[in-house]
Amino acid sequence: MSEIWEIQNSSQLEKIEYDEFKQTLIVTFVRGTVYKYFDVPVYINYGLVIADSAGSYFNKNIARKFKFKKVE
């Protein structure tokens, strides 16, 4: 089952969707681009959800750290 969060504290990220069973994170950026990240541990996802700056957390802990693909 996926959980979806609207991101309020970021100029980069709009929404995230996380599937704990599959450990996939789908990130929707404010410009409309969507990427899917694979093998993302649940603690990384929740860190993103509670971060003071979701964009900074994403850049430090997710971007270029996990395999990903652009969602068309």
Spans of features found by a protein language model:
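Acidic/histidine-enriched, beta-strand-rich ligand/metal-binding domains
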Residues: 2-72
